[in-house]
A protein has these predicted regions:
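Bacterial Sec-dependent N-terminal signal peptides
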Residues: 1-25
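A conserved glycine-rich beta-strand in the N-terminal activation segment of trypsin-fold
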Residues: 23-24, 40-64, 83-85, 167-168
Length: 280
C-alpha cells in the first residue's frame, strides 16, 4: 500500500469513527432528561436504583420492572436533585422486564418515543442518569428482531462491560428513545427492548391478583374503563391490604364522583378501623 492510499484509508477510518461518536445536540439534550429511579424497602432503606424517563407531561414514566419487586415505595430524582414520589403502578411485564408508573410530577417535559424502529447499522446512544453531564455512550445497532409482530428487540455492537451494568435508555440520532437496555453478560452484546412496548402496558380489573404487581407495595392505577375500575374496587374490598383499598377507593371517587360504589367501599374501610367519623 503506497502512502497516498494509506492516507485515504486512515482518513476514512477517522471520519467513520467521528461520525459514530459525535453526539447530535438532540441526543445530548435528551440524555439530560434521563432521571434516577430509587425504590425502597418497607423499613425505608434503599432497595434498588435504575434509570427512567417521562413519556408524557402528566408524570407518566417507564423503566425496568426489577427495581420495583419487593418495593414499598419509590421516588424519581431529576438532574437538579429534586425528588418526586411514584404514586401508582400503571402496568408491568415480567417477561420483558418493563414497568410503567405514575408520579406526582406534572408539567414535565417528556422524552419522545420513536415511532419508527431503528435498523441494523444505525447509530444509537446509551444514556443514564448523571451520565457524564449528558454525554452518552455511542454504539450501533448490530441486529433487530421483532416480537409480538410490531415491537423491536435490539442487539447492539456494545458489550455489557463497556458501560454500566444498570439499565440505560437507548436514543436514536434524533434524540428519541427507542428502547431500554437489558444487562447482559460481559462477553455478550447489550440488548434493548422497544420502549413502545412499555407504553402499551396497562392495568385491568384483575391487576390486584397479578402475581407481579402483588409484589409491589405501590397501588395499581384504576383501569381506564369504568367496569374494569369497579371490578378492581370490588376485589380490593376482599383483600387485607387496607392502604391499597383506601387508595383505590379514593381514586374511584375522584374519577366517578356521582357513583356510590367508591363512597360505600371507603365507608366500610373506615368502619373496619373504627374511624366512624370518617365513615359518616
Amino acid at each position: 500500500m503506497n502512502k497516498k492510499h494509506f492516507i485515504i484509508l486512515l482518513a476514512a477510518i477517522i471520519t467513520a469513527y467521528v461520525q459514530c461518536n459525535a453526539q447530535p445536540s438532540k441526543v445530548k439534550t435528551a440524555a439530560k432528561s434521563v432521571f434516577k429511579l430509587t425504590t425502597y424497602k418497607a423499613d425505608g432503606s434503599i432497595l434498588a436504583e435504575s434509570n427512567c424517563i417521562f413519556t408524557d407531561s402528566e408524570g407518566t414514566a417507564i423503566s425496568t420492572l426489577t427495581p420495583f419487586i419487593g418495593a414499598a415505595k419509590a421516588t424519581i430524582t431529576d438532574t437538579r436533585g429534586h425528588q418526586m414520589e411514584v404514586t401508582r403502578m400503571l402496568g408491568a411485564n415480567e417477561l420483558y422486564n418493563f414497568a410503567k408508573f405514575k408520579t406526582e410530577a406534572n408539567k414535565i417535559k417528556p422524552i419522545q418515543i420513536a415511532s419508527e424502529p431503528s435498523k441494523p447499522g444505525d447509530a444509537v446512544w446509551i444514556a443514564s442518569y448523571g451520565n457524564d453531564k449528558g454525554n452518552p455512550t455511542a454504539s450501533t445497532i448490530k441486529s433487530v428482531e421483532t416480537f409480538m409482530d410490531k415491537y423491536s428487540y435490539y442487539i447492539l455492537n456494545t458489550n455489557a462491560s463497556e458501560t454500566e451494568p444498570n439499565t440505560c435508555i437507548l436514543f436514536n440520532e434524533s434524540g428519541k428513545a427507542i428502547g431500554l437496555t437489558k444487562p447482559a453478560k460481559a462477553t455478550a452484546g447489550m440488548h434493548a427492548i422497544d420502549a413502545n412496548y412499555a407504553l402499551s402496558l396497562s392495568t385491568s380489573g384483575f391487576s390486584l391478583n397479578d402475581p407481579v404487581l402483588s409484589q409491589i407495595g405501590i397501588p395499581p392505577a384504576l383501569p381506564e374503563k369504568q367496569d374494569q375500575a369497579l371490578l378492581m374496587l370490588m376485589i380490593a374490598g376482599q383483600k387485607t391490604d387496607t392502604a391499597q383499598l383506601e387508595a383505590i377507593a379514593s381514586d374511584y371517587i375522584k374519577n366517578y364522583p356521582t357513583l356510590i360504589d367508591g363512597y360505600t367501599s371507603l365507608a366500610r374501610f373506615y368502619v373496619s378501623r373504627n374511624e366512624f367519623s370518617q365513615a359518616a
